[in-house]
């Protein structure tokens, strides 16, 4: 790690030592107290056979290793005192929150389009309270974790996310989840414009679409909006001193 590390966040002199996370395009100095692990939309809709993405024709057959890696990152974050924040994407059962024909979301959401093509699915996809909306069984929040509902691709839109972060002094966001090229990237981009430092753990994310969508999203993030790292590097960086993961 020869490159000098970028200082993430405000790096307050509070006696808490900063850690250096191996990342691209350069290492990042981060403090656990200024950092949150963000788990994006790990719901049946996005990660399970029979969920919305699967029914809409997207391949979800390789989400299993992503779930395993997210669990590993969550365990490391909790052990380091880093807040774990789960996003849960969806709308009220009447889909008022989804917007009507006057909203671009009504026209572009593949969940809404799939239900219009298949009326028998109406009320099932991404509806709060339903199986599709639920987080996958393997990634249930633990005591102390935070769950933030959201209604659009970006977790900052019309949600409590920014308030949750600012009230805790969080400046650094470490992203995992689905989909890299949609909700992960959208939230990281919005965070960039709100002065948050965004890192994606590439092996704890999965795209909606072909593999080139994953690679394009990671390229955009590394080049323009944030940093790319891995679950192993995250776990090693934030393991208790003298106790490598």
UniProtKB/Swiss-Prot annotation:
UniProt source species: Pseudomonas savastanoi pv. phaseolicola (strain 1448A / Race 6)
InterPro entries, per database record: Isochorismatase-like_dom, Isochorismatase-like_hydrls, Isochorismatase-like_sf, RutB
Instruction: Please explain the role this protein plays, according to its UniProt record.
Output: Hydrolyzes ureidoacrylate to form aminoacrylate and carbamate. The carbamate hydrolyzes spontaneously, thereby releasing one of the nitrogen atoms of the pyrimidine ring as ammonia and one of its carbon atoms as CO2.
Set out the biological process GO terms recorded for this chain's protein: nitrogen utilization; uracil catabolic process
Reactions that this protein is recorded to catalyse: (Z)-3-ureidoacrylate + H2O + H(+) = (Z)-3-aminoacrylate + NH4(+) + CO2; (Z)-3-ureidoacrylate + H2O = (Z)-3-aminoacrylate + carbamate + H(+); (Z)-2-methylureidoacrylate + H2O + H(+) = (Z)-2-methylaminoacrylate + NH4(+) + CO2
List the Pfam families: Isochorismatase
Protein name per UniProt: Ureidoacrylate amidohydrolase RutB
Q: Which UniProt keywords apply?
A: Hydrolase
The positions making up the signal sequence are: none
Query: Which molecular function terms from Gene Ontology are attached?
Result: hydrolase activity, acting on carbon-nitrogen (but not peptide) bonds, in linear amides
| Active site, renumbered | 41 (proton acceptor), 150, 183 (nucleophile)
Question: What enzyme category does the UniProt record give?
Answer: hydrolase
CDD domains this protein is in? cysteine_hydrolases
């Amino acid at each position: 790690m020869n490159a000098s590390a970028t200082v993430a966040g405000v790096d307050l002199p509070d006696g808490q030592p900063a850690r250096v996370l191996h990342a691209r395009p350069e290492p990042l100095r981060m403090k656990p107290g200024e950092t949150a692990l963000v788990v994006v939309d790990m719901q049946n809709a996005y990660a399970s056979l029979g969920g919305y993405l699967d029914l809409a024709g997207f391949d979800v057959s390789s989400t299993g290793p992503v779930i395993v890696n997210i669990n590993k990152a969550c365990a490391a974050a909790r052990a380091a005192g880093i807040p774990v924040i789960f996003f849960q994407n969806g709308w009220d059962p009447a889909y008022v929150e989804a917007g009507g024909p006057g909203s671009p979301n009504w026209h572009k959401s593949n969940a809404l389009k799939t239900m219009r093509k298949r009326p028998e699915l109406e009320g099932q996809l991404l509806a709060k309270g339903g199986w599709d909306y639920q987080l996958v069984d393997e990634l249930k929040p633990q005591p102390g974790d935070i769950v933030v509902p959201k209604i659009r691709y970006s977790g900052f839109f019309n949600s409590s996310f920014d308030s949750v972060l600012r009230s805790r002094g969080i400046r650094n966001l470490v992203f995992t989840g689905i989909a890299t090229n949609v909700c992960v990237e959208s939230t990281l981009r919005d965070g960039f414009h709100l002065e948050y430092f965004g890192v994606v753990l590439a092996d704890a994310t999965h795209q909606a679409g072909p593999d080139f969508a994953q690679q394009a999203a990671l390229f955009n993030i590394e080049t323009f909006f944030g940093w790319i790292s891995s679950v192993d590097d995250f776990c090693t960086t934030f393991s208790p001193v003298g106790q490598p993961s």
